From Swiss-Prot:
The lineage of its organism: Eukaryota, Fungi, Dikarya, Ascomycota, Saccharomycotina. Glycans are attached at residues 34-36, 45, 49, 55, 57, 63, 65, 71, 80, 89, 99, 107-108, 112, 114-115, 117, 119, 148, 156, 171, 176, 181, 188, 192, 195, 199, 203, 215. It comes from Saccharomyces cerevisiae (strain ATCC 204508 / S288c) (Baker's yeast). The chain crosses the membrane at residues 318-338. The gene is PSG1. With EXP1, the specific cargo receptor protein for the plasma membrane ATPase PMA1, is involved in the transport and/or maturation of PMA1. EXP1 and PSG1 probably act sequentially to promote PMA1 sorting between the ER and the Golgi, with EXP1 promoting PMA1 export from the ER to the Golgi while PSG1 has a role in PMA1 maturation or quality control in the Golgi. PSG1 might also couple PMA1 sorting and maturation in the early secretory pathway with the glycosylation machinery. InterPro entries: Pma1. GO terms for cellular component: COPI-coated vesicle membrane; endoplasmic reticulum; Golgi apparatus; Golgi lumen. Interacts with EXP1. PSG1-N' interacts with ERAD-related proteins involved in PMA1 quality control including EPS1, CDC48, UBX2 and SSM4. PSG1-C' interacts with the TLG1/2 SNARE complex proteins TLG1, TLG2 and VTI1. The keyword Calcium does not apply. This is PMA1 stabilization in the Golgi protein 1. Disruption phenotype: Leads to enhanced degradation of PMA1 in the vacuole.
Length: 392
């Protein structure tokens, strides 16, 4: 092999090496859902003979209206909610024959109480008197035709939390979100409430329709505690929705912040039997924040304590500035008060009593209580000794 041929082979291999070294890693496309995995409508029969097509929907990773399994599975995962309203999946477990983390039991929260009064003639009970009556209470289950399609835990009074500065106010009718939660932009959160809380006092019926409002709240010290409804502050109002499941997903939008990093808002639910003029979002509303995302700095213990006390934004600066101002005003007032009343002050009585105490005559030594019983020998009774010759 000639020299120039070797050179050509060398450069060819070098260029091939550079090409291979600079190659990009193959990007594999994401696996698509197969036909069997995609959510499809399914057919069911409701109320005896009525055919109905049910279309599942996926919201924040949660599948609603999913076709139930033919055989009930006690270990089937269910969906709970974080304090801010984010969904989380709970997987039941069996430990020593007992199911842990099982689906929630709603007890009688969604049942209707029906009372029946029976007389002695109707029952003919051997232990009833002729004039006695028996009142029986019966709990009737709700219609679960549509609520059974909801995979998320429903809100009940036993899931309420405490809100307010002293944490002594129940959160009724809300279970989520918790007060002072932070909703981030482009994230979806679930607002949940106890449906039977909205019972019309006049008719005694539970509201069949409600809608959710989001309103801005100002927290400057001057305005704090003076929350009056301001119609322009309500920036989001949902359509009237069925009050069956007691929940609604909310996706936080960037335009709600109005070019700010975070905003203080209140979440409220309006039942259909209350008009817009009579509805107050702050009566039962939950206060929270919407934000662009996590802040870079980590809040200190002092900042967390201020947040728990309800001191946010620039309120702390007002409090810090007011303390020295009050002290200065107090000393100025005391100075002028003493200056004006300088000629009217007379402390002679006080000084005279103090001087008299210092000039007090002690009296005779023998009359003092402390030495009264002490026997005092005369000087002549003291022993005397004669001097010896050596002492002389």
């Amino acid at each position: 092999m000639r020299f120039h041929d070797s050179i050509l082979i060398f450069f060819s291999l070098a260029s091939l090496y550079q090409h291979v070294h600079g190659a990009r890693q193959v990007v594999r496309p994401k696996e698509k859902m197969t036909t069997s995995e995609e959510v499809k409508p399914w057919l069911r029969t409701v109320y005896g003979s009525q055919k109905e097509l049910v279309t599942p929907t996926v919201i924040a990773g949660v599948t609603f209206s999913e076709k139930p399994e033919e055989t009930p599975n006690p270990l089937k995962p269910w969906v709970s909610l974080e304090h801010d309203g984010r969904p989380k999946t709970i997987k039941p477990e069996i430990n020593k024959g007992r199911t842990k983390k099982g689906r929630p039991d709603y007890s009688t929260y969604f049942k209707t109480v029906s009372s029946h009064t029976y007389s002695y003639e109707e029952l003919k009970a051997h232990n009833m008197g002729p004039n006695e009556v028996f009142v029986e209470e019966e709990y009737i289950d709700e219609d679960d035709t549509y609520v059974s399609l909801n995979p998320i835990v429903r809100c009940t009074p036993n899931l309420y939390f405490n809100k307010g500065l002293a944490k002594d106010i129940r959160s009724e009718p809300f279970c989520t979100p918790y007060e002072n939660s932070r909703w981030k932009v482009d994230k979806t959160y679930f607002v949940t409430w106890y449906t039977r809380f909205f019972t019309d006092e006049n008719s005694g019926k539970v509201a069949d329709k409600v809608r959710v409002h989001l309103s801005y709240v100002k927290e400057n010290p001057v305005e704090k505690g003076n929350y009056k409804r301001d119609i322009p502050a309500t920036f989001f109002s949902s359509e009237w929705i069925d009050n069956d499941n007691g929940l609604m997903p909310v996706e936080v939008r960037d335009e709600w912040l109005q070019d700010q990093f975070d905003r203080r808002i209140v979440v409220s639910v309006q039942p259909i039997y209350i008009s817009d003029e009579d509805f107050d979002p702050l009566q039962y509303g939950i206060l929270l924040y919407i934000t662009k995302g996590s802040k870079v700095f980590k809040p200190t213990k002092e900042q967390l304590a201020l947040d728990d006390a309800g001191i946010t934004n620039d309120q702390w600066y007002y409090v810090a500035l007011s303390i020295p101002t009050v002290v200065v005003v107090f000393f100025v007032f005391m100075y002028f008060f003493l200056y004006v009343n300088g000629k009217n002050r007379d402390f002679t009585d006080v000084t005279r009593k103090a001087l008299n105490k210092k000039r007090r005559v002690l009296g005779k030594f023998s009359e003092m209580k402390k030495f009264k019983n002490m026997k005092n020998h005369k000087y002549t009774e003291l022993p005397s000794y004669k001097k010896t010759s050596k002492q002389n």
